[in-house]
């Protein structure tokens, strides 16, 4: 039986979860990075985000799931516990910030894979950093927020989202 993602005031670490970031990054870089696409929603004049839907509405968007066994194991582990219907890789490009927005799903889960000290989620006078240390985070998307990558390298997160 699955449950809704744990509500968060802003961003919280989900206890008792730890993932091997090196394995996740290896599988992404080796098999999936080639599929990532630019996101241009018309609100930004520069490229801020690149994204790949790995899993959407209970279906993999990638046909060779056997090449990413560790990632597939994590998706199964999380879907056995939490309700969500989309898994994405999201690059946030260096020296960029997104617009203020509220997402459709109230909360989502993030596993930071590649980050730097210039990467921040920003809410009403509050900035929060999520290190790529193997942790799972719940992020409140129902409050106005943005994200910033003031570093020189792209930031990469694996995200689990509710689309409705």
Task: Locate each region found by the language model.
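Histidine-centered metal-chelating micro-motifs
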Residues: 97, 118-119, 137, 142-148
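Conserved SAM-binding loop
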Residues: 128, 133, 140-142, 147, ...
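A short hydrophobic beta-strand segment most commonly corresponding to one strand
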Residues: 107-112, 136-138, 152-164
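Short glycine/proline-enriched turns and hinge-like loops at secondary-structure junctions
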Residues: 102-104, 123-124, 149-152
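A short glycine-rich, His/Asp/Glu-containing loop-to-beta-strand
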Residues: 75-94
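Non-heme Fe(II)/2-oxoglutarate
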Residues: 1-81
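Short, conserved beta-strand element in jelly-roll/cupin
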Residues: 91-93, 102-119
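A short beta-strand-loop-beta hairpin characteristic of the jelly-roll/cupin
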Residues: 114-132
